[in-house]
C-alpha cells in the first residue's frame, strides 16, 4: 500500500466516525422530541379530564384555570381568569405540569407563545394556540396571549416546537 492509499482509508474511517456521531446525536434529539410528545399527550388528557370535572361540577384545581361562561347568569362582576394566571399555576411548583420541562433545551421554559426561529428557546417548548372558528373552512390558529380571558367553550390546540422550529400538532381540547 502506498501513502495515498493510507490517506484514503483514513478519510473513509473519519467519515464513518462522523456519520456515526451525527446519527447518535440525531437519534437522541428524536427520542427527546418523542418523549416531549408523550408529555404533551398527557397534558391534553389532563385538560380533557379538567373539562369533564368542570361540566360535572366537581372540585377543580387550579382555580385560576376555570373558564367563565358568557351565558351563565349570576356571573356578572365575577373575576375572569386569564391564560397567564392559569399557565403559571399549571407549570408552577405545585401545579400538575411542574415536572414537564423543555427536554431539548433544559434551561428554556416549558411553554412558549409561538414557535419562532428567532426565539431559540422556543425549540422543544409546548405551544398553546387558540382556535377560532372560520365559517368558510378550517379554524384559524393564533397564539394564546398571556392576557387572554378564559371563556367557556374556547378551543385550544397543543403543539410542540421541534428542533427545526416546525410545529408538531399533539392534540386539541376545549375549556
Predicted stretch roles:
Residues 1-45:
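Amphipathic alpha-helical segments typified by the pilin-like N-terminal helix
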Residues 43, 47, 156-158:
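Hydrophobic beta-strand residues in large extracellular and virion-surface proteins
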Residues 47-101:
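Short, glycine/small-hydrophobic-rich surface segments
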Residues 63, 68, 74, 97, ...:
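Generic low-complexity segments that are intrinsically disordered, proline-rich and/or Lys/Arg-biased
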Residues 76-80, 107-108, 154:
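Residue-level signal for mature regions of secreted extracellular proteins and peptides
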Residues 81-91, 101, 111-117, 126-127, ...:
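Non-catalytic regulatory appendages
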Residues 119-175:
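Short, surface-exposed interaction loops/tails
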